[in-house]
Amino acid sequence: MRVVLITLFLFIGAAVAEDAGIDAITPEEGKANNIIEAYESPRFQKFVTHCSSHVTQTCSGNDPLNNQEASRMNSPFGLSFCLFDSMEKCLADHKASLKDPQDNNNLASMSSLPGSIQNQPLLIETVKFRAVLKTCSHVSARYCFTNPNVATSALADCLMPSLTHCVYPSSSILLPPPPPPPPLI
């Protein structure tokens, strides 16, 4: 069973790497040029655009139905998880789920892969989207927590443009680099 899983993950990794091509930006180049990796699939972009306001409201602590999320927002790490989890939930609510509704532990196409190769493009698209969404969540959380004014009211104002910039980098305003860390005394 382990061999099958390892082979499956190697296959997925090879397919994603092959699809990315030679012109992919390395993480070092992206950090040096202040470039955030973008996901250009219209299939998921429309849902991300719709879900971003809900996600920022939930994760900034302004959602009265989700007060338990406020305790997780003490660090960029907790905020990053909230952004990713809330986006996944919102996508599932809009039938753009990244998970199989019958199996909450696997990706949508993962369970059908061994029997059929016809789902490979959807699987590659889903794996790419999840990877970019995790990166966007992490970058947005880190950027918004390093902002000088990190009050709860300002957090939602920071998260919305940051998530939008991650999905639509060419049409949104470029984010300035985060401020330098305070000097050590």
Curated annotation (Swiss-Prot):
Coiled-coil segments on the chain, per record: none
Signal peptide start and end residues: 1-17
Disulfide bond annotation, renumbered to this chain: none
Entries under InterPro entries matching the protein: Nodulin (IPR003387)
Pfam families: Nodulin (PF02451)
A GO CC term assigned to this protein in UniProt: peribacteroid fluid
Location in the cell: Symbiosome, Peribacteroid membrane; Symbiosome, Peribacteroid space
Superkingdom of origin: Eukaryota
GO BP terms: nodulation
Induction cue: During nodulation in legume roots after Rhizobium infection.
Alphabetical UniProt keywords: Membrane, Nodulation, Signal
Annotated family: Belongs to the nodulin 20 family.
Protein name: Nodulin-20
Organism for this UniProt entry: Glycine max
